[in-house]
Amino acid sequence: MNNDQFFTIKIVILTFILLSIKYLVSYSINFDEDIFFKILRLSESDFLEYAQMVEGLSNFNLKFDWSIKQPAEKIQSFPIFSFVWHAAIFNLFGYYSFIFLEFFLYFLLLFIFLKVITFIQNDKQIAFFSLVFLLFFLELIIFLMNNYDLYFLHKIKLPLYEIFSHRFPRPLVTSVYFFSILYFIFKIIKSKVSKVKNKFFLLLGFSFAFLINSFFYLSITCLLTLILFLILEFKKKIFYFINLNKYGFIILFFLILFGLSTIFLQTTFSEPTHFFRMGGFEISSIEKLHIAKIFFKKLFQVEILLLIIFSFLIKLNYDKLKILKKNQTYYDFLFYFFLCSFISPLIFLLFSNKVIALNNFWTTVKFSGFFYIYLVFVNFLFNNYLKNKINFIS
C-alpha cells in the first residue's frame, strides 16, 4: 500500500468516526426509531426546508411548489447548484440519499482540504496534523458551547462551522467547491511561467461556476484573489503567461460567465417576492454608503484587529517562522485572500442594488484570517516541537 492509498484510508476512517457518532448514540438511546426519522431529527433546524427543495428539484420542479391552493407562478431563485447532487440521486434512494451523500461529500471535503494544505505546507505529516487538530478544535468548541454559556466561543465557532462543518447545503456542498478552487489555483500556480494543462482550467472553471451559483459572496473573494495574485506573482510576465495559456483562460472565462448567467436567469425568471421572503432587500446609494461605514467600523472589532496584526506580522517574518522559500508563494495566496475578503463586500455593493445575508462576507473575513494564521502556527509548532514525536503517515 502506497502513501496516497494510506492517506485516503485515514480520511475515510476520520469521516466515519466524525459522522457516525451521532447515529450510534441515537441508536443506543432509541434503537427502534426508523433511520428516516433519525435523518430529520439529527440534522440542522433548516434541513427539512432544504430537503423539500431537493425533492422538488429531483422532479425537475424549479418552483419548489408545495401548496395546491396557492401554486407558484415562477421558479424560485435559491442556488440550485448546492442541491444538484442530492437531487440527482434522490429518486433512487429517497431521503436515505442524504446519509450517503453526507458521508461522501464530507469525505470529499476533508480529502480536498488536505490536498490544499499539503500544497501549502509541502509536508503530508504537517498537513494531516493540521487537519486533525482543526477538527478536534472545532469539536471541542461545540462541546464547550453545549455545556457553558460563553459568548466568545460562539464568535470562534461561527466562521469555522460555516466553512468546515457537515451542515447541508452550506458548507457540506459549497466548501467542496471552494477548496476545489484553491486546489486547482495552486496547480496552476505551481507551473510558474509555463504551459498549464487545459484540464486544470476546465476543473477550476466548473468549481467557480458551481460556487458562484451556490455561495456567490465567497466566489467574489476567490475571483478577486486569483486576479490580484496572478498580477503580483507574474508581474511583467502576466500577459506572457495568459497568452501561453490563452485557451485555458478562455475556458475559465466562459465557465465563470456560465455561473453568473445561472444567477441572472434565476433572478430574472423567479418569483418576484421570493427574494424578499428570504430576507433580501433593495438598497439605495445612500444605504450603500451606510453599509460600507458599518463594514469599516467592524475593522476595529478586537478579533478583526488581532487577525490583521498577526497576519501582517507573519507576512513580514516568514524566515523567522521557518517557512521555506518554496512554500511562501502558497502562504502569500492565503494572505492576499484575507485582504481581498475585506474588499469583496465593497465591490459587491458597488455593482448590486439588492443584498441578502451580508454577514456571510464577514464570516469569510474571519475564516480566511484564522486559516492563514492557523496553518503558519501549526507549521511552526510541528517543525520546532513535534516533528520527531508524532508520525501520522507511516
Where are each of the predicted segments found?
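Hydrophobic/aromatic-rich transmembrane helices and adjacent perimembrane loops
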Residues: 220-222, 354-385
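Short aromatic-rich membrane-water interface segments that cap or initiate transmembrane helices
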Residues: 42, 157-170, 284-302, 363
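Membrane-interface transmembrane helices that cradle and orient dolichyl/undecaprenyl
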Residues: 173-200
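Active-site lumenal/periplasmic loops and adjacent helix-entry segments of GT-C-fold
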Residues: 20-179, 213-220
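Membrane-interface alpha helices of multi-pass inner-membrane proteins
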Residues: 199-216
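Transmembrane catalytic cores of multi-pass membrane glycosyltransferases
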Residues: 46, 213-326, 332-335, 339-346, ...
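Signature aromatic-anchored transmembrane alpha helix within multi-pass, membrane-resident enzymes
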Residues: 246-256, 379-394
